[in-house]
Amino acid sequence: MLTSQEKAHFETFGFIVRRQLLSSEEMAAITGEFEDVLNEDRQNKAFAGETRHAVSGFAEKRLLLRQLVEDDRIYLPIEQLLGPDFIWQSSDGNLYVGDTAWHRDAADLELNFKRIKVAVYLDPVGRDTGCLRVIPGSHRAPFHDELRPLNYWRKKQVILEGRSTQAELDQFIKEMNITEGELLFGVESSDVPCVPLESQPGDVVFFNQHLYHSSFGGATGRRMFTMNFAVNPTTDEQVTLLRKNYEIGAKNRRVMQHTISDRKYDEAFLHSDRPRIKGMVAKLVELGLE
């Protein structure tokens, strides 16, 4: 559970770090499952280290990880922040390569479709060795909108990853009235004012997906997995957005995953008899997002 001040911290700044929420024994077991899932996806081939390797549905693929999703230490804070009828959105296990430029995971602040990412790093990460950097308060208007030019750097990256096009970047440059290659806000991407959320194995980061975040200087193959939750969609616009995110997930699987599946969600997870998991996937089943 979050204290009232911890909840206020999250709502105001857009993130909170729960230090050593998971024990060393738990982290050892989780790390073993992480390696097993990603090795299985690569069919036991070595990680080439050329591009990011991401496995969608990561937390759904092993009993230990599914148990973590409904663990009080994860579930109860999410319930406090999103409400008792919150839904499951997705998860992924990642081996990262290079920097991750400034971006937000959600670009729809006006729809009030609140989403939270829970991130767990399996290795120590610092300011200049790949930890998550965040811009506090950037999940709230008007600050969120004022930072929109920052997406330029990330849009260049996703072109290289095969997830966007130069035409889309050109359109963004035109909309923002910026010049390609110029210093946004007068600084390099890595010098944008921010807070580095340095992390040790066992720490867990909760952050609003509208929050601007990045990572710089990390080693090739740094390991991190996420669990993503959302408020229960109550408007047609929110449901449409949920469906759109489902389609984007399918596109990302084709680019970053080795063993491609048409299914976004694991069968055992989607049709679990566990009350908490049943509750958070009920909307997905209702909408046919399997």
Report residues per predicted region.
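Non-heme Fe(II)/2-oxoglutarate
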Residues: 40, 204-206, 210-290
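Short, conserved beta-strand element in jelly-roll/cupin
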Residues: 110-127, 198-199, 228-232
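Short edge-strand/loop segments of extracellular domains
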Residues: 96, 135-142, 229-234
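A short beta-loop-beta micro-motif enriched in histidine and acidic residues
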Residues: 103-115, 192-193, 199, 220-221
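Short, charged/polar surface micro-motifs in flexible loops or helix N-caps
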Residues: 84, 96, 125-127, 204, ...
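Double-stranded beta-helix
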Residues: 129-212
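Non-heme Fe(II)-dependent double-stranded beta-helix
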Residues: 1-13, 19-111
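A short secondary-structure junction signal
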Residues: 100-105, 128-134, 143-147, 217-218, ...
